Amino acid sequence: YKKNIDQLLENTEKQPEEKHRVVVRTNNEIQIIPVNDLYYIEAYDDYIKLFTKDNYYLKKKTMAYYEQMLDSSVFFRTHRSFIINLQQLTKIEPLEKNNYVALLKNGKKIPLSRSGYVKLKEKLGI
């Protein structure tokens, strides 16, 4: 049974719609999350955490995988450990000397690397 679920998950992720949804397993359920529902993604050891408005999901994938899979006009890698949904971005705040954070609609502050800050300003036309 578990093998069948794993196969289903793998096949679902390879379908052309993969840029529009993320498939995760929670306990014995399979959940399909529209990528527009993602607020941000955070690296977590050998996993990543996919954060939505009300929850987060663990997935054994890499940041590079999601950076390639997701639409680069909507998702942006702010730091080696974070990818944000630009539609959830409300502002960029200074933190301390040459450090900034991206503030999301849910109030979460996501760190910006120095290069991430420069690239984000370029992307936003600032």
Which residues does each PLM region occupy?
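Conserved binding/recognition cores within well-folded domains
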Residues: 1-111
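Short, basic/aromatic-enriched C-terminal tail that caps enzymatic domains
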Residues: 115-126
